[in-house]
Amino acid sequence: MVCEKWIFRFLVKGEVDRKEFIGWLKRNFPQSKLLRLILEKLELMNEDPFKYAREKLGADKYGNPMFSIEVTKDIRILYSVDSKNCIVFIWEIGSHKKVYGR
């Protein structure tokens, strides 16, 4: 199925809406250059969440495939995709250690 529009669900600290998510991003990534890079990657994911995936990481708790996308050498976005319902779940954004726990 090809999705014309993707719905984003932000689950970084429990489920939050877009406004709360942007606030969370600004608090956690106050450097304007890094914040801009994160927003650019999210925009690319909005076009096609599979195209820029760095690696497949198994499945989320709903059974959807999980991926990561590289923002910088150390910063990753961990997300999953429900292609049947055109939903992208954002699970975590942070350092390699924070995202992967290692």
Regions found by a protein language model. Give the residues of each.
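Basic, Lys/Arg-enriched alpha-helical interface segments
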Residues: 1-74, 82-89, 93-102
